[in-house]
Amino acid sequence: MRVKKGDTVVVIAGKDKGKKGSVLKVYPKTSKVLVEGVNVITKHQKPSAMNQQGGIINKEAPIHISNVMPFDPETGKGVRVRYEVKDGNKVRVSAKSGKEL
């Protein structure tokens, strides 16, 4: 997976196309990511021991990884990622600007 937790990504497809946010969680088995402020759903929460009140809450739902691209602040757009070996370590690099992500 070319997207990691904490990355800033831009949504390239779907109802939230064009929105930016940071990755909160990555689900490699299902190829999905949870992005802050993107794909917000309304959930009806039952009262429980943890949440006495219950009610309607808004929360982010995971979106497929093919619908996001890592954001490059150098170009201000979503970019493809390639890997390079620097000092024996594999690092992610923007394919356009060549800067490390």
Curated annotation (Swiss-Prot):
Q: Which Pfam families match?
A: KOW (PF00467), ribosomal_L24 (PF17136)
- The answer to whether UniProt assigns keyword rRNA-binding to this entry is yes
Q: Which residues cross the membrane?
A: none
GO CC terms in record: ribonucleoprotein complex; ribosome
SUPFAM superfamilies linked: Translation proteins SH3-like domain (SSF50104)
* InterPro entries documented for this protein: KOW (IPR005824), Rib_uL2_dom2 (IPR014722), Ribosomal_uL24 (IPR003256), Ribosomal_uL24_CS (IPR005825), Ribosomal_uL24_KOW (IPR041988), Translation_prot_SH3-like_sf (IPR008991)
Q: Give the GO terms filed under biological process for this record.
A: translation
Q: Name one GO molecular function term.
A: rRNA binding
| Position of the signal peptide | none
Q: Which PROSITE patterns match?
A: RIBOSOMAL_L24
Q: Which domain of life is it from?
A: Bacteria
- Keyword terms of this UniProt record: Ribonucleoprotein, Ribosomal protein, RNA-binding, rRNA-binding
Q: Which family does it belong to?
A: Belongs to the universal ribosomal protein uL24 family.
Quote the subunit structure annotation.
Part of the 50S ribosomal subunit.
Q: Its biological function?
A: One of two assembly initiator proteins, it binds directly to the 5'-end of the 23S rRNA, where it nucleates assembly of the 50S subunit. One of the proteins that surrounds the polypeptide exit tunnel on the outside of the subunit.
Q: What is this protein called?
A: Large ribosomal subunit protein uL24
Native source species:
Clostridioides difficile (strain 630)
Upper classification of the organism: Bacteria, Bacillati, Bacillota, Clostridia, Peptostreptococcales
